């Protein structure tokens, strides 16, 4: 194959991975805003922990699929793995759509099954996207840069999803049903179907860097590398922080009881729009960092953003909800900017999106640097740890039931502190003597 053909194949592969990156956020971000609907249903009665169960089931699938997804990658390649992930995703969203027909707890259980199946899909797609972009970029800062740019599209769909769901719900009442957001599920199924057809006809060659064959011998494992082993926990807590901050914020603003933020009209619409601003700032952060990541190391980015993140969360926890600010929002229904008066704490938590925007790619880059042929195996392990995106919000939801929304954010404060520790001390590769070719 000529150099020009290889270059064209790499460009096609990168564009395709960017597109799949966007699909991951679309499906994943359905969990928390749809949880607002189920939380209001009879039998659940405003329980924040149960409201987060859909989000939990989505991420719980990672615990079962993480390592198998990594093995799938090494055996059948990137393209076939992606096609399987897309097909499973279509079926998962279809099951969620079916949950709008049964009523009460029966419908809730069907929805949880659909969220669980969708989790298998996004786990497979995540396993494909991150290592391939890292390898296509040649590792190092360039690999991190591609992941950050791809994450920009991920954040764009992550921004639109809660905004659209919130606009369709309006104000949550006991009559609010899953069928109210069927439009979002139609879009998701159409995207999966279209992507499957498109990817089937796109030629993608697996990158030679890090390629595994039947003759490849694994004398060690990713666990043999200290920086990879210590990087497992930051992946676990990071995903919980990324998903949990806007998810709980959406619950807080949508709650019209005395526990909530005190919004009286269109609370769910405002809650979804504010949560969307968090994802929008993640988009902006990834877009900007995608251009500076080649000059600033992943470690430096992590140290700076975790420090700022801890300050923002702590301030949000201590400020009373009577301290308010007029916050600019975007209305997806009118495609225009508007505003709403929300607690200052909400604005501070939204700003955390700028901090979390670079963390996934940076942690992944730090933890897989120098792994070579063990990269795909490590990716499978990291995909298992994405279950943190379901566990941490569930824990926070449990605490918020009796201690309130804002105090329960201590869960994410502690998570930020550990990520700071990893960037400061734990990310150095001290096992360079292990052969990785």
Identify the residue ranges that each predicted region occupies.
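Extracytoplasmic
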Residues: 12-44, 129-130, 245-253
């Amino acid at each position: 194959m000529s150099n020009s053909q290889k270059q064209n194949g790499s460009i096609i592969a990168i564009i395709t991975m960017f597109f799949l990156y966007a699909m991951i956020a679309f499906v994943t971000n359905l969990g928390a805003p749809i949880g607002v609907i189920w939380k209001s249903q009879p039998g659940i009665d405003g329980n924040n922990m149960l409201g987060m169960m859909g989000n939990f089931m989505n991420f719980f699938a990672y615990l079962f699929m993480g390592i198998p997804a990594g093995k799938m990658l090494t055996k059948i390649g990137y393209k076939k793995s992606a096609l399987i992930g897309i097909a499973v995703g279509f079926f998962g969203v279809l099951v969620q759509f079916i949950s709008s027909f049964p009523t009460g707890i029966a419908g809730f259980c069907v929805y949880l099954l659909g969220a669980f199946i969708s989790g298998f899909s996004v786990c497979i797609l995540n396993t494909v996207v991150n290592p391939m972009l890292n390898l296509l970029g040649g590792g190092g800062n360039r690999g991190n840069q591609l992941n950050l740019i791809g994450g920009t599209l991920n954040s764009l769909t992550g921004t639109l999803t809660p905004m659209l769901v919130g606009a369709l719900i309006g104000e949550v009442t006991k009559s609010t049903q899953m069928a109210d957001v069927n439009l979002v599920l139609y879009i998701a199924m159409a995207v999966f179907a279209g992507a499957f057809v498109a990817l089937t006809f796109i030629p993608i060659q697996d990158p030679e860097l890090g390629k595994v064959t039947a003759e490849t011998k694994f004398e060690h494992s990713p666990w043999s590398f200290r920086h990879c082993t210590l990087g497992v926990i930051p992946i676990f807590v990071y995903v919980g922080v990324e998903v949990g901050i806007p998810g709980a914020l959406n619950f807080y603003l949508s709650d019209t009881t005395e526990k909530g933020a005190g919004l009286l009209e269109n609370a769910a619409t405002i809650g979804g729009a504010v949560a969307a601003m968090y994802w929008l700032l993640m988009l902006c952060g990834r877009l900007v960092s995608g251009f500076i990541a080649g000059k600033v190391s992943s470690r430096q980015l992590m140290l700076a953003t975790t420090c700022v993140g801890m300050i923002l969360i702590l301030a949000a926890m201590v400020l009373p909800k009577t301290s308010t600010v007029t916050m600019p929002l975007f209305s997806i229904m009118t495609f225009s900017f508007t505003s709403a008066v929300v607690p200052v704490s909400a604005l501070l938590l939204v700003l955390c999106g700028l901090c979390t925007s670079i963390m996934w790619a940076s942690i992944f880059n730090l933890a897989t640097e120098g792994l070579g042929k063990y990269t795909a195996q490590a990716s499978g392990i990291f995909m298992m740890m994405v279950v943190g995106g379901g566990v941490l919000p569930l824990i926070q939801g449990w605490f918020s039931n009796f201690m309130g929304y804002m105090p329960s954010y201590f869960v994410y404060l502690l998570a930020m502190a550990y990520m700071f520790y990893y960037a400061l001390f734990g990310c150095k590769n001290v096992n360079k003597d292990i052969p990785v070719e």
